[in-house]
Structure formats: structure tokens, C-alpha cells
């Protein structure tokens, strides 16, 4: 299967939405879609009394509206800093490029975002916001965790549209040749970095597992298990679910070029996901030990 010839810049008819070096890209639209749909889902959760029992919802609609800005900044700043620390500084070629072009670290529109960096940025945003609003930060995390797979899903679809983060070579029926005129035109050397062989569409695998499947698991935990009443359970489920999915899919995802060799054949994605699994397992064990407190003890949102 040949990769579809999709321009990463959004077009309206024959016109590209581009102004000099700035362009509206599918990747940017994915962020917008993930944030907007996640915001609406979080609002819906706060308004669904059945998932809270006798407890007061963790945050008000107004607080959710304010939190969106904090989370957006966390995603952008954390995602870029994470890519800089976890990937650019670990890569000899990229370190040399940065030494010659230090301002490129700010060119977010040219790509280069790390999920794990964005995750840490969102965690920081939640902690700071919770302290400011005097909200239990773990319960606030429980409200935001079910939202995250929405953004992950759209982000991975955008990775596929961009023809980036492809998988390893395969002769299976799902193999895709990530090479077309658009990819060549957007590469400085006018080549297809993925080469001429079919590869796993690992972006779509990740969209399915880290996005759709994880969203459904968390929704089941909310609506059937009533885990919004169980402090930390949804955060733990997200950490475990994402970490395990990413750990498994790193085996079909093409290793990052130029990265050093890690022990036991691990990749950077694996090394960053293992702590999520360990933290999620410990937090879920701790959460399940405590009885569900189906009362209004939590707090009254400010």
C-alpha cells in the first residue's frame, strides 16, 4: 500500500493556508481538536451527577474553562522541552545542528514534540492549578486523565498524515510505503526518509491503542466502576494503560535515528514509559485498598 499523497498544510480548495513560514497544519488542527473535544468531555463529566454519587464534582465548569489554558501551555511548553531534553540533546547530529542554529529550538511549527514531555507539562499545570484553586490535585488528575486519550488519538492521526514516526519494515498485509511526492517535496534532500519498503503504520496502531482503546477503558471505569469516586484510580489506569500500550508498540515503531544504544535493547520511549507503568501500578494498588467514600467529603469547588 502506498502512503496517500496528503499535504501536511491544510488547504481550502486549491489554496494553502500558509503565510510565509507559518502555516495551518493538520498537526496543529489535531492539537486544537484534542483540546476542544477534551474540554467538552470534561465539562460533561462535571455535569453527570451519576458518576459522582453524593460527592461534589471536583471542579466547576468555570474552573474547567480556566484549566484549559493551563493545560494547553503545559502541552506546548512541556512537549517542546521534552523533545529538546529527551531527544535533541541525546542525538549527536541534532546537538550539532542546535549549536549552529540555537533559535531552532523555538520553531515549534517545524515539528518536534514529545508526548512524555507534554505529559509532564500537563502534570505541572494540574499541580499548580490545584494549589491555586485549593483542589485535591489527584482528584483533579482523575477528572483530566479520561480526557487525555482524545488528544493522543488526534495527535497520532496527525503523525500519520505527516508521514512521520513510521514503524519498522514489514511484509504483513498492513504495510505502507511511506513515500510520495509530498514527503519528497518537504524533505531538504528531496528524499523519502522511510525508504521504499513497506512499514508498519505504527501511528495508527498508537491512535487505536493509546487513543481509542484507552478512552473506552477509562470510560468503562467512570460509568460502570464509578471510579471518579475512587481517588487516584483513573490517573493510575491512564498511567498503566498508556505505559503498557507504548511499551508494546515500541517494538513495531522504527527506532529514533541517531539515538544512543540503551541497555537491554530499550528505546527512549520504553525508558520513559516504564516509570509510568510502575507509578500507575503502585497508585492503582493504593487506590483499590481504600474504600469508595460516597459522600460529600471531598471539597467544595471554589
UniProtKB/Swiss-Prot annotation:
Enzyme class, broadest EC rank: transferase
Subcellular location: Cell inner membrane
Its EC number(s): 2.5.1.145
Listed GO MF terms: phosphatidylglycerol-prolipoprotein diacylglyceryl transferase activity
Single GO biological process annotation from the record: lipoprotein biosynthetic process
Membrane topology reported for the UniProt record: Multi-pass membrane protein
A Pfam family per the record: LGT
A GO CC term assigned to this protein in UniProt: plasma membrane
PROSITE patterns cross-referenced by the UniProt entry: LGT
Binding-site list for a 1,2-diacyl-sn-glycero-3-phospho-(1'-sn-glycerol): 156
Highest rank taxon of the organism: Bacteria
TM region positions: 19-39, 67-87, 108-128, 143-163, 203-223, 232-252, 264-284
Record keywords, A-Z: Cell inner membrane, Cell membrane, Membrane, Transferase, Transmembrane, Transmembrane helix
First-listed, main subcellular location of the protein, grouped into a coarse class: membrane
Pathway info: Protein modification; lipoprotein biosynthesis (diacylglyceryl transfer)
Function: Catalyzes the transfer of the diacylglyceryl group from phosphatidylglycerol to the sulfhydryl group of the N-terminal cysteine of a prolipoprotein, the first step in the formation of mature lipoproteins.
Family matches, as HAMAP family: Lgt (MF_01147)
Family: Belongs to the Lgt family.
Name this protein carries in UniProt: Phosphatidylglycerol--prolipoprotein diacylglyceryl transferase
Organism from which the protein derives: Caulobacter vibrioides (strain NA1000 / CB15N)
Gene from which this protein is expressed: lgt
Amino acid at each position: 500500500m502506498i502512503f496517500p499523497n496528503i499535504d501536511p498544510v491544510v488547504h481550502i480548495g486549491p489554496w494553502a493556508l500558509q503565510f510565509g513560514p507559518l502555516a495551518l497544519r493538520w498537526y496543529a488542527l489535531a492539537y486544537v481538536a484534542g483540546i476542544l473535544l477534551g474540554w467538552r468531555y470534561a465539562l460533561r463529566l462535571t455535569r453527570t451527577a451519576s458518576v459522582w454519587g453524593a460527592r461534589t464534582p471536583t471542579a466547576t465548569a468555570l474552573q474547567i474553562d480556566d484549566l484549559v489554558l493551563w493545560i494547553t501551555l503545559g502541552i506546548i511548553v512541556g512537549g517542546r522541552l521534552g523533545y529538546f531534553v529527551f531527544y535533541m540533546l541525546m542525538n549527536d547530529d541534532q546537538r550539532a545542528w542546535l549549536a549552529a542554529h540555537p533559535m531552532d529550538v523555538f520553531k515549534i511549527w517545524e515539528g518536534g514534540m514529545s508526548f512524555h514531555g507534554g505529559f509532564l507539562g500537563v502534570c505541572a499545570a494540574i499541580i499548580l492549578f490545584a494549589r491555586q484553586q485549593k483542589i485535591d490535585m489527584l482528584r483533579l488528575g482523575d477528572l483530566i486523565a479520561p480526557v487525555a486519550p482524545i488528544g493522543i488519538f488526534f495527535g497520532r492521526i496527525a503523525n500519520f498524515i505527516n508521514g512521520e514516526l513510521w514503524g519498522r519494515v514489514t511484509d504483513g498485509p498492513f504495510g505502507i510505503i511511506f513515500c510520495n511526492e509530498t514527503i519528497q517535496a518537504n524533505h531538504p534532500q528531496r528524499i523519502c526518509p522511510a525508504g521504499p519498503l513497506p512499514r508498519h503504520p505504527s501511528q495508527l496502531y498508537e491512535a487505536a491503542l493509546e487513543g481509542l482503546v484507552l478512552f473506552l477503558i477509562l470510560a468503562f471505569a467512570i460509568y460502570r466502576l464509578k471510579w471518579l469516586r475512587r481517588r487516584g484510580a483513573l490517573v493510575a489506569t491512564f498511567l498503566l494503560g498508556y505505559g503498557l500500550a507504548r511499551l508494546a508498540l515500541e517494538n513495531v515503531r522504527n527506532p529514533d535515528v541517531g539515538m544512543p544504544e540503551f541497555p537491554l535493547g530499550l528505546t527512549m520511549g520504553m525508558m520513559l514509559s516504564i516509570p509510568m507503568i510502575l507509578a500507575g501500578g503502585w497508585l492503582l494498588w493504593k487506590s483499590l485498598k481504600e474504600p469508595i467514600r460516597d459522600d460529600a467529603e471531598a471539597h467544595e469547588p471554589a
